[in-house]
Amino acid sequence: MRKVFLFLIGLCALSLSAQVTTEPNPIPVGYTGTFKIIFDPMKGSGGMATATACYAHLGYCTATQSWQGVKGSWGTKNQPEFTKRTDGKWEYTINNMFTYFGVPETTPITKLVMVFHDGNGNNSKEGKGAGGQDIYIVLGQESVGKDLFHLFCSVYS
């Protein structure tokens, strides 16, 4: 039993290393302030590990709709461009998500959704979640790697 418990603790520790984090973390529901999205290209699918540029196909979700408010076209350089940090991660600042997406502050934004690319059109490198899925930041929840193991850790730790 002790070995199983230690194994599960180890899995929890691994899952706390997130592919995408935010500052502040969490971003509150209805937040109108400035926040940063920080992307670690070495995690998740790892498809952007060697990229020299980083753009995001970035949108928002409500309870009933996904991928709303996306700027530009997939794979192009007319999407939000992230800045490379000295630690190898990529960063982007949004001053007010409602202004950014061009929607009223009464819009019930529940999540931000994103996929990263290097801006090379149909040949773009792609940064997604570990299973190849889109990346979601749930507003009001810490962005520390929302996988099954993290869910287990948050419930049982």
Can you annotate each of these PLM segments?
Residues M1-T22:
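Bacterial Sec-dependent N-terminal signal peptides
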